[in-house]
């Protein structure tokens, strides 16, 4: 579900099977949708995710408290990416502090290690989606072989990458594309992509398509 303010609650031991997996969404608001676009309705979220129980964020507190009282351990998500640069308190951390304040006698643990283990093993469906992303990337590379020539600008190459990704229904680049010609290829994470490619120069490219969240 690629939508802001979305939350997933997993409680495998909940006596009520209906609430063992819950998807929390912001309630659609027709006025806001005129400005920001449509948000998922409950039935749409179920179709996309397979999760049957959809609740709105504005009623989460009433649902969460009885669930918390049935649990001993609470696993919370935080950003444990070693490359993260944002030192400000983000929403996940604020939510964690709020939970600890409201339910101080529970045991709090990190969900990141569990998520890493889950990500390490892909289902056949996930592998198929990843392969689609790889195929789009390969197709884009072959397009660039015909496009790149002396005098072309790095950002023009990047534009071709975007074009091919979008034409193949990719969500866009999986990460910031590197198009580094000449001496700039020695910069490990060159992302300016704003120089002209000269005759005889090597062009280093690092790019990949995102497809289906992969």
What positions do the PLM features span?
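Active-site pocket-lining segments that scaffold enzyme catalytic pockets across diverse folds
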Residues: 122-169, 175
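Hydrophobic beta-strand core residues of beta-sandwich domains
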Residues: 68, 121, 148-149, 197
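A composition/biophysics-driven feature that prefers long, compositionally simple stretches
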Residues: 1-139
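A broad detector of the eukaryotic-type serine/threonine protein kinase catalytic domain
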Residues: 116, 142-146, 183-184
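Short flexible/disordered coil segments
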Residues: 32-54, 143-145, 167-179, 208-211
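Short catalytic-site patches enriched in acidic/histidine residues
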Residues: 97, 111-114, 152-214
